[in-house]
């Protein structure tokens, strides 16, 4: 997608690429955000499994955090935004995630879950009142907008079952399921 986003950004830079109830992003903006996020994630030591987790309601930022992870060579772990801090902590520990992305509605639970799981990097949007959370926009500004490398191999995403017969279980899904 970064190549696709870059091509669209060149052809139609000001055309809408992504819209949610609070904003609309152009192809040029999406291209820059994905590349900045991917380059930052690519440069971060995420351990052997290279996992990030996204604990947020549906939004442009939620999708872009997942895409940044995918193109940054990480396995993305969606965490259901309805979960309690304890339930989210279980998934964060079990998945061995290193970065947690949150929004204003999950930040408090995400901070608690990240502490319990040993995650020290929590990045969020609309979370200005939480000093433990790195601001998404500020974080992105520290990353390079250059096209992320093509040779980065996407890793399988890790989705968790509902846990109807016990604790949720992680199931790896191929990255091409979402973008391929």
Name the predicted role of every residue range.
Residues 23, 38-86:
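Conserved AMP-binding/adenylate-forming
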Residues 3-26, 43, 131:
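AMP-dependent adenylate-forming
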Residues 26-28, 156-180:
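Conserved AMP-binding A3 loop
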Residues 83-113:
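Conserved ATP-dependent adenylate/AMP-binding module captured primarily in the ANL superfamily
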Residues 14, 143-162, 166-167:
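Conserved pre-ATP/AMP-binding loop-to-beta segment of ANL
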Residues 56, 79-80, 120-129:
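Short beta-strand elements of ligand-binding domains
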């Amino acid at each position: 997608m970064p190549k696709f986003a870059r091509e669209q950004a060149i052809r139609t830079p000001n055309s809408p690429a992504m819209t949610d109830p609070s904003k609309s992003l152009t192809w040029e903006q999406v291209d820059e955000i994905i590349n900045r996020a991917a380059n930052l994630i690519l440069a971060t030591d995420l351990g052997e499994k290279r996992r990030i987790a996204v604990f947020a309601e549906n939004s442009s930022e939620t999708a872009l955090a997942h895409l940044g992870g995918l193109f940054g060579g990480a396995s993305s772990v969606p965490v259901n935004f309805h979960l309690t801090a304890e339930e989210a902590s279980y998934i964060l520990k079990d998945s061995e995630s290193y970065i947690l992305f949150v929004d204003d509605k999950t930040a408090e639970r995400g901070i608690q879950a990240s502490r319990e799981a040993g995650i020290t990097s929590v990045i969020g949007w609309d979370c200005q009142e939480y000093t433990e959370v790195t601001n998404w926009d500020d974080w992105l500004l520290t990353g390079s907008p250059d096209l992320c490398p093509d040779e980065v191999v996407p890793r399988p995403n890790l989705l968790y079952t509902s846990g109807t017969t016990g604790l949720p279980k992680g199931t790896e899904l191929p990255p091409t399921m979402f973008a391929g």
